[in-house]
Amino acid sequence: MAWPGPLLLKDRKGRAYLVFPKEGGVFHHHKGSVPHEALLEAGPGGVVRTHLGEELSVHRPTLEEYLLHMKRSATPTYPKDASAMVTLLDLAPGMRVLEAGTGSGGLTLFLARAVGEKGLVESYEARPHHLAQAERNVRAFWQVENVRFHLGKLEEAELEEAAYDGVALDLMEPWKALEKAALALKPDRFLVAYLPNITQVLELVRAAEAHPFRLERVLEVGWREWEVRLPVAHPRFQQVGHTAFLVALRRWKAS
């Protein structure tokens, strides 16, 4: 029997569960259990029932769903921010991109899918346990070999000059990586930083003035979900609030 990658199960209340099917495995729900073999037989789009009769729908997780339910060793980059970073970086298939602050690998997956199988993501993480978890998360979801993981800091890496089409930073002190990022980034391409608080933004913008970068924009990404149950519609009571500021810098040719 061929075992697929991760599957997502949803119960009648919309609660989601990420499952990695394996031979002899069993998924346990508070309303019963179901063998992993049954999940494979149902397949994505199918339905299974636990031994107590609870109905579960079977899905192949989207990238957003996988990021929200995968194991984490660090606070994740939310999907709304990760997709916005890909847009701000203006990534396309075949490009090469640098990432610093791999964390749990969520943003890494968005970058890897954006550059495609002919592109490359070089991801740097200073903490070994974060890097190990990120590698497991990425390999489990993404079978394309277009990500290289590096243990260490970007500012200490040996990088080829003007060889990368984008730089994505998720660091507490991203200004320390600006010099190396400026060296590696192609002219007229972008560096995008993910920063939780505005004091970090001010520090980064101030530091960028000493390097060949120009500030393009600083933004927050809103995300407002609605509850629609005909004939009633209203915003959901629980909303995702502030997650981070995104800072986009453009590399220019130094005179």
From Swiss-Prot:
EC number in record: 2.1.1.220
PROSITE patterns given in the database record: SAM_TRM61 (PS51620)
GO BP terms, alphabetized: tRNA methylation
CDD domains reported in the protein's UniProt record: AdoMet_MTases (cd02440)
Molecular function per GO: tRNA (adenine(58)-N1)-methyltransferase activity
InterPro entries xref list: SAM-dependent_MTases_sf, TRM61_C, tRNA_MeTrfase_Gcd14
Key words, A-Z: Methyltransferase, S-adenosyl-L-methionine, Transferase, tRNA processing
Top-level taxon in the UniProt lineage: Bacteria
Binding, S-adenosyl-L-methionine: S104, G105, G106, L107, E125, H130, E155, D170
Top-level EC class as recorded in UniProt: transferase
Catalytic activity: adenosine(58) in tRNA + S-adenosyl-L-methionine = N(1)-methyladenosine(58) in tRNA + S-adenosyl-L-homocysteine + H(+)
Disulphide bridges: none
Single GO cellular component term: tRNA (m1A) methyltransferase complex
Protein's job: Catalyzes the S-adenosyl-L-methionine-dependent formation of N(1)-methyladenine at position 58 (m1A58) in tRNA.
PANTHER family in UniProt: TRNA (ADENINE(58)-N(1))-METHYLTRANSFERASE, TRNA (ADENINE(58)-N(1))-METHYLTRANSFERASE, MITOCHONDRIAL
Family membership noted in the UniProt record: Belongs to the class I-like SAM-binding methyltransferase superfamily. TRM61 family.
Domain notes: Contains a large catalytic C-terminal domain that binds S-adenosyl-L-methionine and a smaller N-terminal domain that may play a role in tRNA recognition. Domains are connected by a linker region.
Quaternary state and interactors: Homotetramer composed of a dimer of dimers.
Protein's recorded name: tRNA (adenine(58)-N(1))-methyltransferase TrmI
Organism listed in the record: Thermus thermophilus (strain ATCC 27634 / DSM 579 / HB8)
